[in-house]
Design a protein with these regions (language model features):
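Short N-terminal segments immediately surrounding and downstream of signal-peptide cleavage
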Residues: 21-36, 153-171
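Residue-level preference for beta-strand/loop junctions
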Residues: 65-67, 117-119, 269, 333, ...
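Outer-membrane beta-barrel channel domains
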Residues: 155-429, 436, 440, 503-512, ...
Length: 688
């Protein structure tokens, strides 16, 4: 009886009133009921039949699983029960829900103005059956037209989150961007309609339209009764939730120790201690702040990169993090802070201002905007309506090379960019991209003309003159072959001389890059097996400029692909998880042309392309030809799914074979083994 009452209550969460010309759907056994009595009978009979027929898999029962199977369904104008969407972390539960609804008896349809119409319901099936529900799905009824269900519509699903264990899940905060976690998210985004996946990181509030994040995490919870056990294995370290505000505090670590095959150091290590504070004030404003205190000693080839990329007032650039101060015995000290404010005034706009990273694209790499460089100050506007998502991004960047400093200060430069994502239909997405890089000319800061969010920057750059900036345009696309397979691409154009493009001369000024890739979710019908393949090619001198400060880079690192330009690269990735256990494997092969004998062959975006080797005969991998192979294998265990604290171990094989060895880059064969404990909330890139 309790099970009946609970599901009846949730079915009736929104009361629907029908006029005399309207009738509610009539379920078997309710033929003699009318008006409100008919509605109550429908809810009671339907609930009873669903509970009687629903069988929870024995494995979940044995594991004391608790969760919700949220079902969105239609009672069609033909009287059939048509399941539109099932949201659950387990395919077995989804299959069971679809089977139960598929076997329900035919009902008499609802009517409006005397004609049959579709009516939509939302029902949470609580596991164990009859347990007290925490979230409730609110039904939405369309009476004047047939319903086309789009899981992205925010009003379709409303979760009650007061005193939730995960207040961030319904906030306007960013989901931390790591390739491993986003491989899981993208599967659910791709299953839905009208989803946009190229602009990252995603907002939690957007993700909840496609996936029940709370259920995914609670499914991994350990049965702990002590407060310490819950904090270690399941929950936020500290959390406060009130009616008008909330915040969480979590300590974070990245503690690693390892060994490579060099004789220069006894062992490698990373020692990061950090704290993250996140919260919300009211319904529309959220904040996040993270501070990292880090020391590390890396494999030889990473140390060579750090020291080769000098920084004013420091020893070098730690990849993806920033300024590194040298320590004894080859280590580096590299503190960093990241923070942002996120404000969402309505369902169309989100505004963010902060210090961090962004990513535009659907691949492992990106030629539009990647997260390989250090964090930067930025202001972002995200606009979403109809089938459009429009992203504006303004970035404050630094050229930290000592040789370009003025009065011991690093020159400032700016990037204004926008990206338009358009869902052409249910399968095809097309994106348009434009960015312009300018310098701090006459110390006047960001040119006000570039704050126009809808202007074409290339035209502004043209009117300001050839020295006014460096513009880049691009096109990306994604095609959903099935719910499990997607193909994606990017094309970036830095400069083009049309008359020289097809003449076969290899003209240097035709600077472009492109990407082709595919993703396969639940590959070969193996749950949670993810496969990805990707090809990246960049012409020499792409992303560079005659004035090096106007290159597409920040803090000695590219804003696009980690390898800069003048290369081709192929990447193959496999990921698998089972409960809290996970494994990742990645193979990278490629060829790149490096500079030699003081000549600029087009691989270093920080060199002026005025010093190019020639105007014609420019080919990919020209210069000091280098073959690169990198194999990376990692396995681990998620200690806390709420904070993504992980224990892991991994091994990296790297073969770097140059035609000619130089003083800065030498031929190396590296085997690097690491184990550690880390809070996995950002990407490390050592595949260069």
């Amino acid at each position: 009886m309790k099970k009946l009452l609970l599901l009846i209550f949730t079915l009736c969460a929104v009361h629907v009133t029908f006029s005399q010309e309207d009738t509610y759907p009539m379920y078997k056994g309710c033929e003699n009921k009318q008006d409100v009595t008919l509605e109550n009978c429908f809810n009671e009979k339907l609930t009873a039949d669903i509970l009687a027929a629903f069988n929870v898999p024995q494995e979940l029962i044995s594991n004391n699983y608790k969760g919700t199977v949220n079902v969105i369904f239609l009672v069609t104008k033909e009287g059939n029960f048509d399941v539109l969407y099932v949201r659950t972390a387990y395919k077995e539960l989804e299959d069971e829900a679809r089977k139960v609804f598929g076997n329900l008896p035919k009902a008499s349809p609802a009517t409006y103005n005397g004609r049959p119409v579709d009516i939509r319901f939302g029902m949470p099936i609580q596991i164990p059956l009859g347990s007290q529900p925490t979230p409730k799905i609110i039904e939405k009824v369309e009476k004047q037209q047939e319903i086309i269900y789009e899981p992205t519509a925010k009003e379709d699903i409303t979760l009650i989150t007061k005193n939730s264990m995960f207040p961030e899940h319904t906030s306007e905060l960013n989901i931390p961007f790591t390739h491993s976690s986003y491989a899981d998210l993208d599967y659910y985004f791709n299953k839905g309609e009208n989803s946009h996946t190229s602009s990252k990181p995603y907002l939690f509030s957007d993700a909840t339209n496609h996936i029940d994040l709370s259920e995914l995490k609670t499914a991994l919870f350990k049965n702990k009764t002590s407060k310490g056990g819950k904090k270690l294995w399941n929950e936020h370290f500290f959390s406060v939730q009130k009616e008008d505000y909330w915040f969480t505090i979590n300590p974070m670590v990245d503690l690693q120790i390892g060994k490579d095959n060099s004789d220069n150091i006894d062992f490698t290590y990373n020692n990061t201690r950090a704290v993250q504070i996140q919260g919300g004030i009211g319904k529309n404003l959220n904040f996040s702040s993270s501070f990292y205190e880090s020391q590390g000693r890396f494999s030889d080839y990473v140390t060579d990169f750090i020291r080769a990329n000098g920084v004013l007032g420091a020893s070098g650039t730690v990849p993806g993090r920033g300024k590194g101060k040298g320590l004894d015995q080859g280590g580096f000290d590299y503190p960093i802070a990241e923070a942002y404010l996120s404000y969402t005034p309505n369902k169309f706009f989100n505004f963010q201002f902060g210090h961090g990273k962004n990513f535009i694209g659907d691949g492992y790499r990106s030629f539009m905007l990647s997260d390989v460089a250090s964090p930067y100050t930025h202001f972002k506007i995200s606009t979403q309506f109809w089938k459009i998502k429009y992203t504006n991004l303004w970035m404050w960047l630094d050229d930290v090379r000592p040789e370009v400093s003025v009065n011991e200060l690093s020159p400032r430069k700016y990037v204004a960019m926008h990206h338009l994502s358009w869902n052409v239909n249910k399968r095809l997405n097309i994106g348009l991209f434009e960015a312009v890089i300018t310098e701090n000319e006459s110390n006047r800061g960001f040119d006000i003309e570039f704050f126009n969010p809808v202007i074409f920057y290339r035209a502004v750059e043209f009117t300001r003159g050839s020295e006014g900036g460096n513009a880049i345009i691009g096109l990306n696309s994604k095609y959903k072959l099935t719910n499990n397979i997607t193909a994606y691409s990017q094309f970036i154009l830095d400069e083009l001389t049309v008359g020289r493009f097809f003449d076969g001369s290899g003209y240097w000024g035709n600077k472009f890059a492109f990407q082709l890739g595919a993703k396969y979710f639940n590959a070969f019908k193996v749950d949670n097996l993810f496969l990805q393949g990707e090809l990246n090619i960049a012409r020499p001198y792409t992303f560079s400029n005659r004035r090096s400060i106007l290159n597409y880079g920040h803090f000695n690192q590219p804003l696009a692909h980690l390898w800069g330009s003048n290369f081709w690269e192929a990447v193959a990735i496999a990921r698998y998880k089972k409960g809290r256990w996970f494994g990742n494997a990645k193979i990278t092969i490629g060829q790149k042309g490096f500079d030699e004998n003081g000549l600029n062959y087009g691989g270093n975006i920080y060199l002026s392309n005025d010093n190019r080797i020639a105007n014609e005969g420019i080919d990919i991998t020209q210069g000091n030809f280098t073959s690169i192979f990198i194999g990376d294998i990692q396995a681990g265990y998620v200690v806390n799914p709420t904070t993504n604290l992980q224990f892991f171990g991994g091994i990296t094989f790297r073969n770097f074979d140059q035609a000619t060895q130089t003083s800065t880059i030498s031929q190396q064969n590296t085997t690097w083994f690491t184990i550690g404990l880390k809070t996995d909330i950002f990407n490390w890139y050592f595949d260069f």
